[in-house]
Amino acid sequence: MAKFSLKRGLDIPILGSPEQKIYKGSEPNTMAVMGPDFNGLKPKMLVSEGEKVVKGTPLFCHKDFPEIVFVSPCKGIVQAINRGERRALLSVIIDVESLSDNGINYNKLHGDINSEKVFVRKCLLDSGLWSSFLTRPYSKIPSPDSEPASIFITAMDTEPLSPNADLIINNNLNAFQEGVKRVALLTKGKVFICKEEESQLEVENFETYEFKGPHPAGLAGTHMHFLDPPNASKTVWSIGYQDILAIGKLFLTGFLDTERIISICGPLAKSPRLLKTYLGASLNDLLKNEFLNLSLIHISEPMRLLSISYA
C-alpha cells in the first residue's frame, strides 16, 4: 500500500467537533434538486409544477446529453421550478409525500441487458447517479459514452469537523465493495481508493492509497497530483465515498438510495453530531432547533442540500 504525507495545509481549530455517532435527522417536508450543483449544466425540463413524481422520476436532463437525467429524490409533487437570471435553473422543489417509497426498480428495468458494462452504465445514467462523477480537468459531469483513464474514489474527508469516513463506510461495507466493483467497469485503467492514515478499509482485488496530513490531504485533486495527474489529453474521474455507497445499494437492491450522513457542528451547534438525512433535504426542516444562532451555520459537504438563508 502506497503512503503519502502532506506537511502543509489547512487545520482550523474550530470548537464544536461532532460526536462520531450517527443519529436520525428530522424528516424533511420538502426536498430539492439544485441546478448550481452541476457545473456546465444545460437543463431541459421533463416535468411541470404540480406533477406527481416517485423516487427516480427524471425531473430534467442535460440538453447536450439527454441520457444524463436528474431525478426526484422522493415520492411527492413538484411544488416549484425556480429560475434565476437568464432563466438559469436554480432548483426543482418537491413536496414530500413518502420517504419510504422505493420508487423505480432499475434492476428489473434493465434486466434484459446482457453486457454487464452496458448494464452498469445504463443504470447509473437512468438513476441519476451518473452525475456523482466529476471529470478532471474541468470538474464537469462526464459525457455518457466517455471512458476515463482512471477513477479516484475519495474514501476520506479532511475538512474541519467532517464525518469519519471509515465509520460511515463500515456501516455499509458490502455496499461500498459492490459500488467499487461496479464503478471499476467504467474504465480500463486503475481505480484508486484513497483513504486516511491508519484507516483499516480494504476492498478485495483493489489497492488502497493512504494519505496523511491536514486539508487538502483528503481532496481528489491532491490524490490525482500524486497518483495519476490529468492533463489536456488525459481525463480522470473522481467520486465520493457516499456516492459509492449509493451505487452499491443501487445494484444490491435495484433501488435508488438517497440517504446521506452529514455533520452538524461548530461552536453554535447545540449538540454537534452526525445526522442521517436525505439528498436534497430542506435545511429549514433539518436544522430547526439545532443551532443557538441560525445566522451563522456550518455543515460538512458530502451531500447536496437545499440551500437557504437566514436573516
Description of each model-found segment:
Residues V53, L59, P302-R304:
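Hydrophobic heptad-repeat coiled-coil signature
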Residues I297-A311:
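Single conserved hydrophobic/aromatic residue that forms the stacking wall/gate
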Residues I68, N82-D285, N289-L296, S300:
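Buried, small/hydrophobic-residue-enriched core segments of structured protein domains
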Residues M1-L46, C61, F211:
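N-terminal, Lys/Arg-enriched amphipathic/low-complexity engagement segments
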Residues M1-I14, K21-I22, Q79, G84, ...:
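Mobile cofactor-carrier "swinging-arm" domains
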Residues N29, S72-C74, L90:
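A generic structural signal for short beta-strands and their flanking turns/coil linkers
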Residues D37-L41, V53-G56, F65-A80:
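Generic structural motif
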Residues V47-G56, N82-E85, G280:
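Acidic, glycine-anchored pre-beta loop/turn
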